[in-house]
Amino acid sequence: MATMVTTTTGLAPTMQTYYDRKMLEWAKTQFVYANYAQKRSIPKNNGKTVQFRRWNLFTPNAAAQILTEGVTPDAQNLSMTEINATVSQYGAYVEVSDLLDMTAMDNVISDSSELLGEQMGNVLDMIVRDVMHTTTNIQYANGKVGDNNIAASDVLTVDEIRKAVRTLKKNKARKFTRKGGKPHFVCICDPSATYDLQSDSLWQDVSKYSTAEQIYDGELGKLFGVVFVESTNEKVVNNGTVDVHDTFVFGADAYGTIDIAGSGAIKAIVKPHGSSGTADPLDQRATVGAKVAAFTAAILNSEWLLCIRHAVSA
């Protein structure tokens, strides 16, 4: 007896583009740490390593920069430090039964792509956060030494922010710029930390900015030339007595990531009912997946990425 094989096609190209774009947009809504990184694309057929570049600053020398009339000075040499990082793939999927797809009030496949995009966005942002946590530039609240010595009273204060700014300035950290605003550093902290800061009279809420400047997603306010952005995925470690929180204050190009809108793109993978052949003989299952082709993060300059370790008030 002959066996009849029925071939079914996957998503139409227009639908594939739609789900890819939708998943990417939902992933981006979860980005906080990844938003301020130097972005790099991965060259195809170039192995699993991505190369980030950190240009080394020129040393100011007034005597060496004096020009002599009619004499062309010697050119300066560009110098850079290369930081290599190995990429990994990330992904997840859900199964959708034919009965659920038929009886549900909403478009299950569309909703699943949103949920998976949000999940992968959180995963990638936490990967960036965990890399930032490894910075060697650490400031402990109240002058304490080590996580184990942080007490409940060692909360984030305005003075700690001022100390962080002083350190970054001494390290010649490059500032961020944006339309209509002054150059600034960025601080990422959790809601409990901003709660402790916002009671200070020096805090400038975003609604009270004196100039019409472009603002970041999730921006809360400014303090001493630092723009504050909140994340609910902040790194927290318990030292046996209290939870020790990370608050990051940093300049531009302090760390880098893969640009997921480029070669490290997040992709929606939809296998519709009837696409599995003999593995699903009654066409009962469809799957919706999210896959990130390649992603990694790396610290490019620890001196420009400072982590304040502190407790938070109850």
Predicted regions and their residues:
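Short, flexible loop/turn elements at secondary-structure junctions
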Residues: 56, 98, 116, 189-193, ...
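Hydrophobic alpha-helical segments involved in membrane association or supramolecular assembly
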Residues: 52, 114, 118, 187, ...
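Alpha-helical scaffold segments that mediate packing/assembly in large oligomeric complexes
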Residues: 99-175, 313
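Extracytoplasmic
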Residues: 47, 89, 182, 223, ...
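Short acidic, glycine/tyrosine-flanked loop/strand segments centered on an H-E-D-like triad
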Residues: 77-104, 264
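Sequence/fold signature of self-assembling virion shell proteins
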Residues: 2-33, 149-170, 192-314
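Aromatic- and glycine-enriched pocket-lining scaffold segments that form the walls
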Residues: 175-194, 198-200
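N-terminal "assembly arms/tails" that initiate or stabilize quaternary assembly
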Residues: 1-85, 311
